[in-house]
Amino acid sequence: MEPQAAARAVLLVAAAYLIGSIPWGVIIARLTGGPDPRSLGSGRTGGANVMRALGPRWALVSGLLDAAKGTVSVLLARALGAGLEVELLVALAAIVGHSRSVFVGFGGGRGIAPGWGGLLVLQPFVAVGVLPIFGAVIAATRYSSLGSLIGSATAGVVIAALALTGSLPPAYLAYAVAGPALIWYFHADNIGRLLRGEERKIDPFGGRRT
């Protein structure tokens, strides 16, 4: 990679991290006068905790804005002709920014929304295809975290299979491993609570649960 291209890649990854760091859940809570999502449930800023704090309508808004962080990051890299490898890197950087936000003391969400938003640009059919799985798991169990874990793992397996069979460029194989790995890492405490039977449930159709 030439020095100019390398510098552009570094700047795009840094920009994606900062875009990912925008704490929409906290911003919405302040604008609406509602409780800070960090004060409830898991203490995170993502959609599930916004639902606990503000209800499903604002959780949907927060989730869409969080997803847009991944979408915008990848589209920016694509618009600047940075290449596939950089597009994949910025998609991952948005996940990290969302989960380790510089604006809220390196806390944040779990990464599923910006991860899905980036995937929507990179592989839209896979992104849309995992939505029913994500939704079905949450509807059946009321565990948002379990839906995120299974949904991200499913997307990773599908993308890895496509890369291994030559249907996608080889660079996607690393992305298929790194993306779900990051999301699972940021769900580490959820995984522990799931295994102990202590995970918090949500009501995806309207109520608030803690």
Language-model region placement:
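Interfacial segments of multi-pass membrane proteins
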Residues: 51-54, 77-80, 93, 97, ...
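Multi-pass membrane catalytic core of lipid/isoprenoid biosynthesis enzymes
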Residues: 52-78, 107
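Short, non-helical or kinked segments that cap or interrupt transmembrane helices
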Residues: 35-47, 103-116, 143-152
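Loop-to-transmembrane alpha-helix initiation sites
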Residues: 128, 144-152, 167-179
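N-terminal signal-anchor transmembrane alpha helix
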Residues: 7-33
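Helix-coil boundary and interhelical linker segments in multi-pass alpha-helical membrane proteins
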Residues: 1-12, 68, 72-89, 120-127, ...
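C-terminal ends of transmembrane helices
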Residues: 25-28, 95-107, 133-141, 188-192
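Cytosolic, membrane-interface loops and tails of multi-pass inner-membrane proteins
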Residues: 26-59, 107-108, 190-210
